[in-house]
Every structure is written in C-alpha cells, then in structure tokens.
C-alpha cells in the first residue's frame, strides 16, 4: 500500500493538523515507511503462538460474582443532607 500526496492532505485535514505543501512529500515518505513496516509484520508466522496480555504469566484475581449492597450503605449516605432507606432524597425536577 502506498500513500499519495492527496491522502497525506486528507489525513492532515481529518487530524486537524496544519501541513504546508513543502511538508507533504516528507510526510508521504514517513507514512509509506510506517505502512511498509506494518506489511513486514504481516509476514511473521505466528501459528501456535498464544496471545499475550503481559510479559509475565499471571492470573487475574477473581471474586465471587454475587449481588450485595456493599455493606456500607450507612457510610455512603452519611454526608447526604437528606436520605430515606439508604437513598438520597433530592428535589423533584420534572413534573
């Protein structure tokens, strides 16, 4: 894939970057070099390679998926000016 000058201008416009006509050829070369590198990556054989999320193998800490109230409802509403049954009371806004 190759990027032409019109594509460079379009990318600059979409990114809201001011690019002068003198800068277009340089940016065109830079973008083409980046795309060439990405094309090289597609040639790498990754069959049998497990996807990685970290460089060190580790397990996520898991907790039981149970519904609870957090057991701190009194603390949550402690600073509220007005509450009822662990709910915040607010003035009615919509009729």
From Swiss-Prot:
Q: Per UniProt, what is one Pfam family of this protein? A: GatC
- GO function terms (MF aspect): asparaginyl-tRNA synthase (glutamine-hydrolyzing) activity; ATP binding; glutaminyl-tRNA synthase (glutamine-hydrolyzing) activity
Q: Please give the catalytic activity noted in the UniProt record.
A: L-glutamyl-tRNA(Gln) + L-glutamine + ATP + H2O = L-glutaminyl-tRNA(Gln) + L-glutamate + ADP + phosphate + H(+); L-aspartyl-tRNA(Asn) + L-glutamine + ATP + H2O = L-asparaginyl-tRNA(Asn) + L-glutamate + ADP + phosphate + 2 H(+)
Keyword set, alphabetical order = ATP-binding, Ligase, Nucleotide-binding, Protein biosynthesis
Top-level taxon in the UniProt lineage: Bacteria
What Enzyme Commission number does this protein have?
6.3.5.-
Query: Is-annotated flag, keyword Zinc-finger?
Result: no
Gene Ontology terms describing biological process: glutaminyl-tRNAGln biosynthesis via transamidation; regulation of translational fidelity; translation
* Keyword Amino-acid biosynthesis in record: no
Q: Which PANTHER family match?
A: GLUTAMYL-TRNA(GLN) AMIDOTRANSFERASE SUBUNIT C, MITOCHONDRIAL
Oligomer status and interactors? Heterotrimer of A, B and C subunits.
NCBIfam families attached to this UniProt entry: gatC
Q: Which family does it belong to?
A: Belongs to the GatC family.
Q: Which named protein is this?
A: Aspartyl/glutamyl-tRNA(Asn/Gln) amidotransferase subunit C
The source organism is Rhodopseudomonas palustris (strain TIE-1)
Q: What is the lineage of its organism?
A: Bacteria, Pseudomonadati, Pseudomonadota, Alphaproteobacteria, Hyphomicrobiales
């Amino acid at each position: 894939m190759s990027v032409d000058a019109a594509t460079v201008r379009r990318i600059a416009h979409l990114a809201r970057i001011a690019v002068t006509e003198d800068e277009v050829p340089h940016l065109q070369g830079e973008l083409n070099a980046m795309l060439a590198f990405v094309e090289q990556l597609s040639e790498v054989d990754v069959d049998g390679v497990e996807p990685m999320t970290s460089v060190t193998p580790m397990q996520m800490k898991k907790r039981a998926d149970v519904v609870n109230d957090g057991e701190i409802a009194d603390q949550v509403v402690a600073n509220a000016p007005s509450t009822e049954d662990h709910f915040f009371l607010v003035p009615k806004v919509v009729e």
